[in-house]
Regions:
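Signature of WW domains and closely related Tyr/Trp-rich beta-sheet microdomains
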Residues: 1-25
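Short, low-complexity cationic-aromatic patches
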Residues: 4-7, 75-79
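Interfacial aromatic "cap" segments that immediately flank transmembrane helices
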Residues: 28-48, 79-104, 146-197, 225, ...
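Selective recognition of hydrophobic, aromatic-rich stretches within alpha-helical transmembrane segments
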Residues: 49-71, 124-164, 192, 197-235
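Short, small/hydrophobic-residue-rich motifs at membrane-helix boundaries and re-entrant hairpins
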Residues: 21-41, 45-71, 78, 82-145
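Short, flexible beta-strand-to-coil junctions
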Residues: 7-8, 15-16, 50, 117-120, ...
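Alpha-helix boundary/capping detector
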Residues: 111-118, 178-179, 196-200
Length: 242
């Protein structure tokens, strides 16, 4: 049942009291839980997110639309639907490009590790070294990608794919918005750990529980929306060449 909205559009009835639909002061981490139909919008958007590729693109577009709504002063999540696909293409493409580069580098290291491991005991130490390097590279990439998450989302949307692919520009923007970038990274990191822990803990009891838990991913993106609103793409130009 649709939420009851006041005539001026500024208030909605939650069944017990009138709540504001406009931003009033600083938003907390769970700001969206006091907005109309938030649970249904998160759940349906999460279901759409289960669709390979299309779901991920739509979720990114939904997050950027939520950012625009909060920036304009509306304390509300966007309705669920597929209308955010176009908006989500840019950040998805940027992430895909960096992902392909990572796969190529890791693939070369994995192949080198396999070759040295099969060359006899004399090359086993080298193979272990390549394996360790590959692990450290994956760990570093994951941590850096968390730190650059806000920059990728905002820069790809505001500046376009071509400029957002530039790693020096992304790094400059992330450093210029250091507190925001770090907060987004920590929120997403904590959410990832929580999801992984719950998935492992419940997988032995409830089959496919990880899919059910992943339905809450839109809520994680909703948590970082206030930070995306505060992120400034004008804060820094691309770093000069060294």
């Amino acid at each position: 049942m649709p939420a009851l909205i006041s005539q001026d559009g500024r208030w909605w009835w939650d069944g017990t009291q009138w709540r504001s639909r406009v931003v009033e002061g600083k938003l907390d981490l769970f700001w969206f839980t006091s907005t109309p139909e938030w649970f249904a919008r998160v759940l349906i958007t999460g279901l759409i997110g289960l669709i390979p590729i299309v779901g991920a693109i739509n979720l990114l577009g939904w997050t950027l639309t939520a950012t625009d709504m909060v920036r304009r002063g509306w304390k509300e999540l966007p309705p669920a639907g597929f209308q955010y696909l176009e908006r989500g293409v840019a950040p998805f493409v940027v992430g895909l490009v960096y992902g392909v580069v990572l796969i190529l580098v890791v693939g070369i290291l994995a192949l080198s590790t396999l070759v040295f491991a099969m060359s006899g005991r004399t090359h086993l130490v080298i193979a272990i070294g390549f394996a360790l390097l590959m692990f450290l590279l994956l760990l570093a990439w994951w941590l850096i990608s968390l730190y650059l998450l806000a920059a990728v989302l905002v820069a790809s949307d505001r500046l376009g794919i071509a400029k957002a692919i530039d790693p020096t520009r992304l790094l400059a923007l992330a450093r210029a918005n250091h507190d925001i970038s770090l907060h987004v990274a920590l929120v997403y990191l904590a959410a990832s750990i929580a999801v992984a822990t719950l998935s492992v803990a419940t997988s032995f009891i409830v089959p496919f529980s990880s899919l059910v838990i992943s339905l809450g991913l839109p809520a994680v993106y909703a948590m970082i929306v206030p930070n995306l609103v505060a992120f400034r793409v004008e804060a820094a130009p691309s770093l000069p060449p060294t």
